Amino acid sequence: MEPPMEPSGGEQEPGAVRLLDLPWEDVLLPHILSRVPLRQLLRLQRVSRAFRALVQLHLAGLRRFDAAQVGPQIPRAALAWLLRDAEGLQELALAPCHEWLSDEDLVPVLTRNPQLRSVALAGCGQLSRRALGALAEGCPRLQRLSLAHCDWVDGLALRGLADRCPALEELDLTACRQLKDEAIVYLAQRRGAGLRSLSLAVNANVGDAAVQELARNCPELEHLDLTGCLRVGSDGVRTLAEYCPALRSLRVRHCHHVAEPSLSRLRKRGVDIDVEPPLHQALVLLQDMAGFAPFVNLQV
């Protein structure tokens, strides 16, 4: 694309080359604008019509967009302008928009970007099943999805996701408290074969039935977060140890019904567990209470 003509506002020295005189697609876009933070691009586009056209051309070719690069808060109008022409996004993160992001804001972006592989919508509580339906229907290559703290995610929404996202590998459902065992069981049966990372943290509705079904259907599962899942017990953990050979990390803090014997088999395999063994806990307590730090070997 040739740079549009723009009045210089003054005489140009003979032989001098302005920034905008450089080839846009061969030099400016890949080697200069690709290194400029989004926040600075918003300022740059105000300089002139030519700079605005250059920035818009760059934005149209974005493969990754993280709203956090703009700032902790981003106005609706700014997001709409930044993503107006983007049609090749592969990664999209919109957590800073959580206070106002609606279906009307998000669905057109999803529709224009069917190549999306990673989407982060953590805390976006104004969305609904419609947005998740558009994502599942329009982005068949989706691999990673964060819906943490999205209270609107229910069993029906998760079923639609499980039915239409064959490439799904990583799913964050932290604090999606409407989800119950039945929804997780369905997810495991439909998409378990490809799941590698799953968070069900802070959901008191999730119990052993869901964990056992995940274990039996997710042979490639590497990371599972069950923090605060109060109904999960030792039976679920034992099933994980039996059926999940690829498991690398397990989070069970505040799962008060999970006993050490069910965790010991995973510890022997080197699985990273966020709860210390009872002996270690006792020694730390002894150290704290009696001041025996110089005398207690915590590596017993």
UniProtKB/Swiss-Prot annotation:
SUPFAM superfamilies: F-box domain, RNI-like. Residues 113-269 are annotated as: Interaction with SMURF1. It is found in: Cytoplasm. The keyword Cytoplasm applies. Its main location: cytoplasm. One of its GO terms (biological process) is positive regulation of BMP signaling pathway. It holds the Pfam family F-box. The keyword Signal does not apply. LRR repeats lie at residues 141-162, 167-188, 194-215, 220-241, 246-267. InterPro entries: F-box-like_dom_sf, F-box_dom, F-box_LRR-repeat, Leu-rich_rpt, Leu-rich_rpt_Cys-con_subtyp, LRR_dom_sf, LRR_FXL15/At3g58940/PEG3-like. Keywords: Acetylation, Cytoplasm, Leucine-rich repeat, Repeat, Ubl conjugation pathway. The modification N-acetylmethionine is found at residue 1. Pathway: Protein modification; protein ubiquitination. One of its GO terms (cellular component) is SCF ubiquitin ligase complex. Gene3D superfamilies: Ribonuclease Inhibitor. Residues 19-66 form the F-box domain. Substrate recognition component of a SCF (SKP1-CUL1-F-box protein) E3 ubiquitin-protein ligase complex which mediates the ubiquitination and subsequent proteasomal degradation of SMURF1, thereby acting as a positive regulator of the BMP signaling pathway. Required for dorsal/ventral pattern formation and bone mass maintenance. Also mediates ubiquitination of SMURF2 and WWP2. Belongs to the FBXL15 family. Part of the SCF (SKP1-CUL1-F-box) E3 ubiquitin-protein ligase complex SCF(FBXL15) composed of CUL1, SKP1, RBX1 and FBXL15. This is F-box/LRR-repeat protein 15. The gene is FBXL15.
